[in-house]
Amino acid sequence: VLGPKKDHNMYYDFKNFVYSRRLNYVDYDELDEPQLIEKIRALNVDAAVVCSFNYKIPRILLEATKDGFINVHPSMLPKYRGGNPYSRVIMNGETETGVTIHFMDDSFDTGDIIAQKPYHIHSKATMGTIFNELNVVGIELLLQVLRAYEVQPLPRIKQPNGDFISGKGLSEQELFINYNKTAEEIERFVRALNPFI
């Protein structure tokens, strides 16, 4: 298991959780360091699964497994690529989002799609409710994908090229209420930041 870097506030909690499950934890300083690549290659891994990992994974690491890296992304790609689709879908007034499981490539959230599952956004949903519910949807979909992977190669559906709505993280300037917006936009904004931001 690869987790957050040592300077991340969740490092020790995550590492202790991994050890409590009697799994191997691999420490690293940089994702492209030769020691890490060799450790992954030595494990003879078929594929790696990535969830909530906001660092770009270099090609040399992506190629260290037999079939590559698989990412669980909380949106219906190609819409809302990036690190915070949860807030963006609420702020934009979307009524549907979902989870995409896809192969990783050199860019963020642009790899071939394996599977998708839509999710209806309730009218009073917050970032927190969507985050929690999409985690459940993502786990269920990932289990289906991994079971299928045990018996056959996974499908690879190319994502279309083009400009799509971004799911990037919020900038500091975006964390303040703009009172020039409508009441509906402000209400969505508050829900989009509740409870994490």
Give residue ranges: language-model regions:
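One-carbon transfer enzymes
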Residues: 1-195
